[in-house]
Curated annotation (Swiss-Prot):
4-aminobutanal can spontaneously cyclize to 1-pyrroline, and 5-aminopentanal to 1-piperideine. Coiled coil: none annotated. It catalyses: 4-aminobutanal + NAD(+) + H2O = 4-aminobutanoate + NADH + 2 H(+); 5-aminopentanal + NAD(+) + H2O = 5-aminopentanoate + NADH + 2 H(+). Homotetramer. Keywords: NAD, Oxidoreductase. Pfam families: Aldedh (PF00171). Its EC number is 1.2.1.19, 1.2.1.-. This is Gamma-aminobutyraldehyde dehydrogenase. The active site is at 246, 280 (nucleophile).
Length: 474
């Protein structure tokens, strides 16, 4: 397995402390990788800064060609990437290959096209004898911090728009799941000029902090927890860096009495438990109107009970393990606290799976109340709660009564209600009669403590640029 870092166009071994990388399906150590040293972090940033002088002035066509080549080699090596992702994350292999790899390739291809559509503005004469122009220019060096739930996908979301806009990037994947990013480094080094892409390995304290705090870094992009976002914002405040934050969610799923219950059940069974629930948009916080509450709980419980946990390389496996032992304990603790309330009922699941690996049974909890921790706090596991509501006004207020603001969905046959409720929800995305669906052309990003800035779409590309005014006297 490729375990070297990419610094200034060269694959080099880390010079810091070795860290174990685990297979969460077995709990075994896959390998140990040496972290980047402080000197290597500095070298990566300085390489990116040096490369920016030329890369930032390349034409959109040149940048697009590089991104398209990278998309092609990812596609050609799709099986290799899927196997690495499956072993390192515990994802079902068929899901990694069939769902994630095509989406990752599409992100690079989309931004290759978008790079050629990012225009400034010829503003004209607002002062006699002077012509103004508006430019959108790259920022410089971007430090990108990717999470452990979708390692390669999030690397794509961060690399593609930044590079398309003309920036140079130093990427740090999670130390828990670094293998696909390091494999990407091996393939990218022969496509992009030296220093344009640098990929490091290490923990937040030893690598993330010196990277994000480096004086030559102009922007920090994070997908991670609220706590990590808060730390980075505080850590970078003195250098006034631009920050781009996607910090998780607790998606409300509002099910009205007139909803298609079978569609809701099928949707939540899929969208609430995909990737073992380790998704910031997971359909995890259901509000069911009183007329269909009992029916929904019964049917959904039966459906969730059929979800198959198992070995990632088994074609019939629907749920793999959680990413780490520490995360398994966090999920288990959240469910135990919910059970201890006395009013929350476990419909199915609610326990760790016996045997090796970090498996937690797909869980449905009914009877949750608005102020319960299971409703208010992100669990980030295969755990869905159901809360009864009376009317539209109540459920909109409850849905918005959350520190999160990333994703939401509304299930109803009433088109007017769908528009009315969607307009009032304080979430970056609202789906109607579906959930979880993402495309490269549409923006993804949150409000409130879920963060700010957009991934994907032309809005995502613009986030990696600076607006400049040029005035010419004539």
């Amino acid at each position: 397995m490729q375990h070297k870092l990419l610094i200034n166009g060269e694959l080099v071994s880390g010079e810091g402390e070795k860290q174990p990388v685990y297979n969460p399906a077995t709990g075994d150590v896959l390998l140990e990788i040496a972290e980047a040293s402080a000197e290597q972090v500095d070298a990566a940033v300085r390489a990116a800064d040096a490369a920016f002088a030329e890369w930032g002035q390349t034409t959109p066509k040149v940048r697009a060609e590089c991104l398209l080549k990278l998309a092609d080699v990812i596609e050609e090596n799709g099986q290799v990437f899927a196997e690495l992702e499956s072993r390192n994350c515990g994802k079902p292999l068929h899901s990694a290959f069939n769902d994630e790899i095509p989406a990752i390739v599409d992100v690079f291809r989309f931004f290759a096209g978008a790079a050629r559509c990012l225009n400034g503005l010829a503003a004209g004469e607002y002062l006699e004898g002077h012509t103004s122009m508006i430019r959108r220019d790259p920022l410089g060096v971007v430090a990108s911090i990717a999470p452990w739930n979708y390692p390669l996908m999030m690397a794509a979301w961060k690399l593609a728009p930044a590079l398309a806009a003309g920036n140079c990037v130093v990427l740090k994947p999670s130390e828990i799941t670094p293998l696909t990013a390091l494999k990407l480094a091996e393939l990218a080094k022969d496509i992009f000029p030296a220093g344009v892409i640098n990929i490091l390995f290490g923990r937040g304290k030893t690598v993330g902090d010196p990277l994000t705090g480096h004086p030559k870094v102009r922007m920090v992009s994070l997908t991670g927890s609220i706590a990590t976002g808060e730390h980075i914002i505080s850590h970078t405040a003195s250098s006034i860096k631009r920050t781009h934050m996607e910090l998780g969610g607790k998606a409300p799923v509002i099910v009205f009495d007139d909803a298609d219950i079978e569609a809701v059940v099928e949707g939540v069974r899929t969208f609430g438990y995909y990737n073992a629930g380790q998704d910031c948009t997971a359909a995890c916080r259901i509000y069911a109107q009183k007329g269909i509450y009992d029916t929904l709980v019964e049917k959904l419980g039966a459906a969730v009970a059929t979800l198959k946990s198992g070995a990632p390389d088994d074609e019939s496996t629907e749920l793999g393990p959680l990413s780490s032992l520490a995360h398994l304990e966090r999920v288990s603790k959240a469910v135990e606290e919910a059970k201890a309330t006395g009013h929350i009922k476990v419909i199915t699941g609610g326990e760790k799976r016996k045997g090796n690996g970090y498996y937690y049974a797909p869980t449905l909890l009914a009877g949750a109340l608005q102020d319960d921790a299971i409703v208010q706090k992100e669990v980030f596991g295969p755990v869905v709660s159901v809360t009864l509501f009376d009317n539209e006004e109540q459920v909109v207020n409850w849905a918005n009564d959350s520190q999160y603001g990333l994703a939401s969905s509304v299930w109803t046959k009433d088109v007017g209600r769908a528009h009315r409720v969607s307009a009032r929800l304080q979430y970056g995305c609202t789906w109607v009669n579906t959930h979880f669906m993402l495309v490269s052309e549409m923006p993804h990003g949150g409000q409130k403590l879920s963060g700010y800035g957009k991934d994907m779409s032309l809005y995502g590309l613009e986030d990696y640029t600076v607006v400049r005014h040029v005035m010419v006297k004539h």
